[in-house]
């Protein structure tokens, strides 16, 4: 029987830093990376482009099953490009409107089922770092290390505000805080795969921690469990 590649899951709410930490960790280990949130953002983006209502579960299920998407590592190896239907949409899916749409479609059971096997297909040698909201509870429940990363809503809004201002976007800190709180409520209260720590997850509050400190904490856990060999 073939032994599956190891998986490290990093779950948490919007703005907790899980995507940044997961990317740095995957690069450090030389492992594959799954940004599961990008799949839901891609679906929301594709739905908008194809005129599909975000409450039409059956149409979204079909769209999810046939998403023409590729994840490509950038030439510098510093990140990934996301290609949808032949178009680079890496930046286009990273706005607040698409993020809100992603949270909506992620609450639909048929959509989550359609994307489940696609996410599990990322589990390849030498290993996988998977970030999202239900990686440790639903997608990879047998992962040897599960991390649940959080931070206060105010800190998460502040981080997002600085990111968007750096890109030249005209945003309000108070509106971002409102959006994050609304998204938290949707994600934690949905009937299917609600956002919550796995029972065996390591919980880290990054409110007062730098990205480097969070990464070091996770690397220490990896060493203790001898996961990366």
From Swiss-Prot:
Belongs to the cytidylate kinase family. Type 1 subfamily. ATP binds at residues 12-20. Keywords: ATP-binding, Cytoplasm, Kinase, Nucleotide-binding, Transferase. SUPFAM superfamilies: P-loop containing nucleoside triphosphate hydrolases. It comes from Pseudomonas syringae pv. tomato (strain ATCC BAA-871 / DC3000). This is Cytidylate kinase. The keyword Amino-acid biosynthesis does not apply. Its main location: cytoplasm. Its EC number is 2.7.4.25. InterPro entries: Cytidylate_kin (IPR003136), Cytidylate_kinase_dom (IPR011994), P-loop_NTPase (IPR027417). It catalyses: CMP + ATP = CDP + ADP; dCMP + ATP = dCDP + ADP. One of its GO terms (cellular component) is cytosol. Signal peptide: none annotated. The keyword Amino-acid biosynthesis does not apply.
């Amino acid at each position: 029987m073939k032994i599956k590649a190891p998986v490290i899951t990093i779950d948490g709410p919007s703005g907790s830093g899980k995507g940044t930490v997961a990317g740095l960790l995957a690069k450090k280990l030389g492992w594959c990376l799954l940004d599961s949130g990008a799949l839901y953002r891609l679906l929301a983006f594709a739905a908008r482009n194809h005129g599909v209502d975000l409450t039409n579960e059956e149409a979204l299920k079909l769209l999810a099953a046939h998403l023409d998407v590729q994840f490509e590592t950038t030439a510098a190896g510093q990140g990934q490009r996301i290609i949808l239907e032949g178009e680079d949409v890496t930046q286009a899916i990273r706005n607040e409107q698409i993020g809100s749409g992603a949270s909506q479609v992620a609450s639909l059971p048929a959509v989550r089922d359609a994307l489940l096997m696609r996410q599990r297909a990322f589990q390849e040698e030498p290993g996988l770092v998977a970030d999202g909201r239900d990686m440790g509870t639903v997608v990879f429940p047998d992962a040897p290390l599960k991390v649940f990363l959080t931070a206060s809503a105010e800190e998460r809004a502040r981080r997002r505000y600085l990111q968007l201002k750096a890109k030249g976007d005209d945003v309000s800190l108070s509106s971002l805080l409102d959006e994050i709180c609304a998204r938290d409520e949707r994600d934690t209260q949905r009937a299917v795969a609600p956002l919550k720590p796995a029972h065996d997850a390591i919980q880290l509050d990054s409110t007062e921690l730098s990205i480097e400190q969070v990464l070091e904490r996770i690397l220490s856990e990896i060493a203790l469990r001898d996961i990366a060999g």
